[in-house]
């Protein structure tokens, strides 16, 4: 509480004024704050600064031929940030240090940078020091979750881009984190997705977006009209380990940042936390508002079989 008070004091002293009219809503991970005047709502600031943010680290031991992830680890750090805040929402009774221990910069931590690097190489042939994309990041989270049953959160990654299959999900125990790695355009987000993307922030199960700009990932947690608020991992602190923990202050951001929707990169990961059957039914009911971003089907289509009868003889080309 004292740390958050210091952050608020620091921010309110330097804060730009809010330019949106009174009555405008800020949507923050499924709930809202109403703008009353030119100032940001204090509860919104407090909740923003209370979020866990995991950034670049230096002095890391155990990484192959390197001691820092600065310059290449932002997608991993932003994905860790999404996962850490998801766990905090799911288990509010857990102490912050318990959650941070899962992401410690040491090989034994379940979701450490070491584990992501190892899994990235195993699953996607991504070498240490190479940038992760959304699909690689999601695949790593799912596999690491499977390998750590003591972490009380299951992960389901959408298939075929953005598809959730009910029969597959029914085999996963709650609570479950749904991760949807997708692309909403070519060089920028296609305007046809704007309304649905804005709607996602109003869904109660929404736990954030990882993405941002090409090779510069962030964690997005709130929006005001078409501006998105985000946490930025591009700040380097010294490594956090269980024996030498970093200052708690390095896991919170004292700066409010936002970017316009048209400036976002179209590649991103959507995260939704489903804690029980009731929340799943609520998610299904609301999916119609962002049906082009997340699709739900009963089961995955069977692959089409190819028979020899349909294979052209190589000599046919001579007669065409």
From Swiss-Prot:
Query: What InterPro entries does the entry give?
Result: Papain-like_cys_pep_sf, Peptidase_C54, Peptidase_C54_cat
**Gene Ontology annotations for the cellular component aspect, listed alphabetically:** cytoplasm; cytosol; nucleus; phagophore assembly site
Q: Where in the cell is it found?
A: Cytoplasm; Nucleus; Preautophagosomal structure
Query: Which EC class is the enzyme in?
Result: hydrolase
Q: Which GO terms describe its molecular function?
A: cysteine-type endopeptidase activity; protein-phosphatidylethanolamide deconjugating activity
One BP term from GO: piecemeal microautophagy of the nucleus
- The EC number(s) attached to this protein equal 3.4.22.-
The annotated phenotype of a deletion mutant is: Impairs atg8-processing.
The record places the active site at 74 (nucleophile), 232, 234
Which superkingdom heads the taxonomic lineage of this protein's source?
Answer: Eukaryota
UniProt function note: Cysteine protease that plays a key role in cytoplasm to vacuole transport (Cvt) and autophagy by mediating both proteolytic activation and delipidation of atg8. Required for selective autophagic degradation of the nucleus (nucleophagy) as well as for mitophagy which contributes to regulate mitochondrial quantity and quality by eliminating the mitochondria to a basal level to fulfill cellular energy requirements and preventing excess ROS production. The protease activity is required for proteolytic activation of atg8: cleaves the C-terminal amino acid of atg8 to reveal a C-terminal glycine.
Q: Which family does it belong to?
A: Belongs to the peptidase C54 family.
- Protein name, UniProt field: Probable cysteine protease atg4
Q: Which organism is it from?
A: Schizosaccharomyces pombe (strain 972 / ATCC 24843) (Fission yeast)
